[in-house]
Regions:
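Non-catalytic, conserved peripheral segments adjacent to functional cores
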Residues: 1-219, 223, 262-265, 271, ...
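Conserved metal-binding segment of the jelly-roll/cupin
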Residues: 225-242
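Short, amphipathic alpha-helical segments
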Residues: 136, 228, 247-248
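Double-stranded beta-helix
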Residues: 245-299
Length: 299
């Protein structure tokens, strides 16, 4: 059955950079507190390395680990299992336990339509938000694999060749002026204790009215731009869009959460018609995206 459709007004969201403090009301933004250019410090300097987090109190105090060759920051994110509160337990006195689950989502670039940019530059476009989901009893963490961080793409060519990790491939997205893939984190707080009326099409094709518990607060939707050096944890019950990758390259995410196999407990969805858009005003060339989509269509 398709997800219920909520009515909505026209809403345009302008994304901001993903930071620990800006995302704190909705979950956890995860990134290294160390300078991106740091490669091989001396062992004696590990305990006094600079912290790039603008709010050091938000970052756990590191401890030396691995025979004093590493710094361990713990905990860096909440890992929450609230399945003992699940609605499926009502009427039978016992819930089905949530168990840890690790998955991989290979996310391909989303289509943007022309427009937006607030007149500042031709790059970017509009992303139409047509669906939100939430996991009412579990956090959900997305960890991107193999994507350069935003700082990596700004290094001069001669510095790339001198890195202790080896020279980068000349075809990397960070070279030759190609934008590094980024992703949008689109969220809406839950209106706890409230309900909203939505329309659903039943198995017979008839429209029915249903009530959505703890619906998304669409007036306070936000979007954040994240790069490959950042992971994100959605708080339990936080409404969010499925992952939105922008650019010309697939991004693979390792996803960590709890689940119990009961659809209504694990994931709840609401859909929308036209009206909610994110103005993706960033280093994404809409013409290149259209050419990329044409190439994919020919495969």
């Amino acid at each position: 059955m398709p997800p219920p459709i909520l009515p909505t007004a026209n809403i345009t969201i302008h994304p901001s950079p993903l930071t620990l403090s800006s995302f704190h009301p909705f979950g956890t933004a995860i990134s290294s507190p160390l300078p991106a250019t740091l490669r091989a410090p001396s062992a004696t300097s590990l305990s006094s390395l600079p912290n790039t987090d603008p709010n050091p109190s938000d970052t756990p105090t590191p401890i030396l680990a691995n025979q004093s060759t590493a710094l361990k920051y713990s905990p860096i994110s909440v890992f929450q299992n609230n399945y003992d509160q699940s609605k499926s337990a009502e009427g039978r006195g016992k819930s089905k336990d949530g168990v840890p689950r690790m998955s991989m989502f290979s996310c391909f670039p989303r289509a943007l339509r022309r427009g937006g940019g607030r007149g500042r530059k031709p790059a970017g476009g509009l992303f139409d938000v047509r669906i939100l989901e939430r996991h009412p009893y579990t956090t959900q963490t997305f960890i991107p694999l193999g994507v350069p961080s935003g700082v990596d793409r700004k290094r001069p060519e001669n510095e790339n060749k001198s890195l202790s990790t080896g020279a980068r491939n000349k075809h990397d997205d960070g070279d030759n002026g190609n934008p590094v893939p980024s992703y949008l984190v689109i969220i809406a707080p839950s209106l706890h204790g409230q309900t909203a009326q939505a329309t659903v099409v039943n198995a017979q094709g008839r429209k029915e009215q249903v009530l959505i518990r703890d619906p998304p607060d669409l007036r306070n939707m936000k979007a954040f731009i994240a790069h490959g050096g950042q992971a994100v944890t959605y708080g339990a019950g936080t409404w969010h869009a499925p992952m939105v990758v922008v650019g010309r390259r697939r991004v693979d995410f390792v996803v960590v959460q709890f689940a119990n196999g009961i659809a209504e407990d694990d994931c709840q969805e609401v859909a929308f018609g036209e009206g909610i858009v994110v103005d993706v005003d960033m280093d994404v060339d809409i013409t290149e995206m259209e050419e990329y989509e044409d190439e994919v269509a020919k495969l």
